[in-house]
From Swiss-Prot:
It comes from the Bacteria. Gene3D superfamilies: Ribosomal protein S18. Belongs to the bacterial ribosomal protein bS18 family. Binds as a heterodimer with protein bS6 to the central domain of the 16S rRNA, where it helps stabilize the platform of the 30S subunit. GO terms for molecular function: small ribosomal subunit rRNA binding; structural constituent of ribosome. PROSITE patterns: RIBOSOMAL_S18 (PS00057). Keywords: Ribonucleoprotein, Ribosomal protein, RNA-binding, rRNA-binding. The lineage of its organism: Bacteria, Pseudomonadati, Pseudomonadota, Gammaproteobacteria, Chromatiales. It holds the Pfam family Ribosomal_S18. It comes from Alkalilimnicola ehrlichii (strain ATCC BAA-1101 / DSM 17681 / MLHE-1). The keyword Lipid metabolism does not apply. This is Small ribosomal subunit protein bS18. One of its GO terms (cellular component) is cytosolic small ribosomal subunit.
Length: 74
């Protein structure tokens, strides 16, 4: 029987040595937002707790400044 092997999740920001997540980096932020506009949880993405907090803060700032939409209907 073939067993399904699940890849280990890792934090991309830790691997790349990112110090601070920038709210103006929309290409990165869009990878962590669903089509409906929700922030993807760290258990799905594998992001560490520290960077998940920075990511949420950056996404909320980008939404407030109208760089990212709150929902998909805009």
């Amino acid at each position: 029987m073939a067993r399904f092997f699940r890849r280990r999740k890792y934090c991309r920001f830790t691997a790349e040595g990112v110090k601070e997540i920038d709210y103006k980096d929309l290409n990165t932020l869009r990878n962590y937002v669903t089509e409906t506009g929700k922030i993807v949880p760290s258990r799905i993405t594998g992001t560490s707790a520290r960077y998940q907090r920075q990511l949420a803060r950056a996404i909320k700032r980008a939404r407030y400044l109208a760089l990212l939409p709150y929902t998909d209907r805009h």
